Regions:
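C-terminal beta-strand-loop-alpha-helix "lid" module of Rossmann-like NAD(P)-dependent dehydrogenases
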Residues: 1-295
Length: 295
């Protein structure tokens, strides 16, 4: 049975750990609020980008651009898992990596070659440990991603796609639902779906009322410049979703850790009180026994 002093040391240690987990919970909550604000701020830009591409696409007579090329035979696929640079976030990193490997198994069963582009230290370390060859690794920014980070990733995957090294690019990341819920998502980002160039009847009617636009340069050239920006925006949105998911998962994990620490402190305190009671009882018995021996 543990002594009173040993139990006191354990209680002190757990209390110190609880202070750390509470601090981490507060930091994660603050970062989560900022991430939510950035996601909200991006939405109008992303929606306008979609409208702009659709409008230019309607004006283009023919669209044959590398990023839109749908290849008949898919021989190689690049998987891009978005993970964090740090742990202590519950199952946040594990579920992305697990889904990415499930996608890999499915592709390999079809005879497709898989290439990897890692985002986040946790993903990179797991892929390296499993001896996967990386076609790119982007680290050190997952807490607060910048648009430049999305540009770098977009440039690399576009390079692989246009060079014919891969025929498809799949993004695997956590979509932010709430602080308690993160949903693993697979998204094909290359080739860009031609659906973004399609419009409904209302939009076509609105174009008719506005009349014909004069484009300078030609619509095809504008679209060629817009599509890479569209790809960057899609990746940036996924990075922001992943960041919010990570902070939500970390906040929840640290809250649970603090709760468990409190319960452990209560249990250890009860054990310490019982141990102290047993020591006092033993001392009383020894005193009484000594007094009886003298009588």
């Amino acid at each position: 049975m543990a002594t009173v002093q040993e139990l006191k040391r354990r209680i002190r240690s757990v209390r110190n750990t609880r202070k750390i987990t509470r601090a981490m919970e507060l930091v994660a909550a603050a970062k989560l609020r900022r991430a939510e604000q950035r996601i909200t701020a991006l939405r109008p830009y992303a929606e306008t980008m979609n409208e702009l591409i659709a409008g230019v696409g309607r004006a283009a007579s023919s669209v044959r651009l590398p990023l839109l090329e749908q290849r008949e035979t898919v021989k190689a696929v690049a998987i891009v898992p978005l993970t964090g640079d740090r742990g202590l976030a519950g199952s946040f990193n594990a579920q992305v990596i697990r889904r990415a490997f499930a996608v890999e198994r499915s592709l390999q069963a079809e005879g497709t070659t898989v290439r990897w582009v890692a985002v986040g230290k946790k993903g990179r370390s797991t892929l390296t440990f499993r001896r996967r060859e990386l076609s790119g690794a982007y680290l050190g920014f997952t807490d607060q991603p910048a648009y430049e980070n999305a540009q770098a990733i977009a440039h690399r995957v576009s390079e692989l796609f246009t060079a014919g090294e891969v025929d498809r690019v799949v993004l695997v990341y956590n979509t932010y639902v709430s602080a308690l819920t993160q949903r693993v998502t697979e998204q094909d980002i290359l080739p860009i779906s031609a659906d973004i160039l399609e419009t409904d009847e209302e939009e076509r009617a609105a174009d008719t009322l506005r009349g014909d636009f004069i484009f300078e340069p030609e619509p095809e050239e504008i679209l060629e410049r817009l599509l890479p920006v569209y790809l960057e925006t899609q990746i940036y949105r996924a990075l922001l979703e992943s960041t919010a998911s990570e902070q939500g998962a970390r906040m929840t994990a640290m809250r649970n850790a603090s709760k468990n620490a409190g319960e452990l402190i209560d249990t250890l305190t009860l054990r310490m009180n019982r141990a102290r009671q047993a020591e006092i009882t033993q001392e009383i018995l020894e005193v009484v026994g000594g007094a009886e021996a003298l009588m």
